Amino acid sequence: MANQLRERHQGLKKKYRELIDGDPSLPPEKRNQVNLAQLLRDSREHNKQLSEELKELKQRLAEVHGDNKLLRMTIAKQRLGDEEVGTRHFPAHEREDLVQQLERAREQTEALEQSLKAATDELQDVRAERNVYQEKAHRLNLEINHILGSHENRILDIDALCMENRYLHERLMQLQEEVSLLKSNVMKYKSALESKKNCKVYGKSNSSALTGVLSAKQVQELLLSEENGCSLPVTSQSISDLKSLATALLETIHEKNMVIRHQRQTNKILGNRVAELERKLKTLEVSGLWSLPGITYNVSLGLGRRKAVIVLSDSQHVQSTTEQSVHLTPEAMVADEEIVTGEEVTEDTGLSADFSQDECQAGAVELNQNSDYFTHTYSVSATPQVSTPAENIQPVESMQSKTLALCDSERSACTAERSEQHDEDLQSGGHQSMSTEASLKALEEQAVENDNFSGDCESQGALEDSQPVTSETSGSFDCISGSESCTAEQQTERSIEEETEHASLNTSPPEQTSPHQECPSS
């Protein structure tokens, strides 16, 4: 090996000298060109040899790595005696990395466990605080209900009270602004009246008749005189008249703008009120709480220009007449507006009641039962009924023993009752909860007298079936009667008679009669 290397070294040294010195037989120029070409060719061959050697060395290195790995696996198998140890064997540095990763994961797990414990403790605190607030709200509801003297089973809604309080506060602020505006107008009129009186006292009768306050007639006369050719003379009096006219018109425009602004504010308040009520109704509809105590539905009845209102209380007790499921109130006799809460009902929506003769005769309700609620639903027909004063109420379920109180009383008693209840409605303004105890006492006193009228009710029940009766708002039942087979002419005649009776009742003083007469079922 050493001899071969020595011979190779001698040969390479000889070639190197020949390349440097060149062939002595050639001229110097040719000698340099031959040397450069030979050097380039030799360098290329040398590069090829080196690249081949590099590939061979890389292949041998890969083979050596494979042999080392196989040898390590064989040694590990011999030590542990496990055939599957090859998949679990790691070098020392890889084991260190795995241990470090495991420690970091353990630290993260401990941190997450601590945060979970903290979140659990916070959740328990929040739940305890929520329970405390719920109990506090329940106690406040009970206390407020006890203070207001309401029914024990009808807990008041604090949110509803707050909403009503906000609405009343806004209306109060608006009314105060309107009062201030009216006061300013009154002061203006007073100043104009005083100036006119002073002119009369000091003898200034020739002064202008125009003041800061002008009526529409004065403005019209002044403008018509200008149009007819009677122009005002250019004097100080005419100039003052025109100035006062312009001032009065400007003040009138300002007042109109104030009125429009107040009207817009009123519309905004009413819109917010309607939106709050719609949100509350939507919440009740989603949660399925339509049958809670205290929920009422005011449904209008088409009575021509007059609109009566039926209040359907879904879940009130039967024991008191102020908490019955049907109330007919002529609230729209005072104004053409109607309040509709609960389900949406239009102005022309008709509410109709088709009762059979057996149901009309056996329609008395036992008022001494304390445990049952009205659970019947009523389908409201959307057909507008203008000439018919009272339409059909169709119960969806079959009416059992606890149904609506239908009383066929005498015509004179019902007329006096309607007059009395109409006057009470105008005075009370729809506050039927304040007169509950009085109506209950009156019912207890009237229960003894009703026994004497039971025979008359049976005999006159057929004659009074087709007569619609408008009932009270102060918490008592009225006589609801309807005929199953009625022609259009009879309904028209009844509506005309009803309007005349209402007109006579508005002028006649109310009689001192009982607000309710109950007729037992035949």
UniProtKB/Swiss-Prot annotation:
Keywords: Coiled coil. Residues 429-438, 467-490, 503-522 have a biased composition (Polar residues). InterPro entries: Coiled-coil_dom-contain_pr_149. Residues 413-522 are annotated as: Disordered. It comes from the Eukaryota. Residues 1-196, 260-287 form a coiled coil. The keyword Coiled coil applies. Belongs to the CCDC149 family. This is Coiled-coil domain-containing protein 149-B. The gene is ccdc149b.
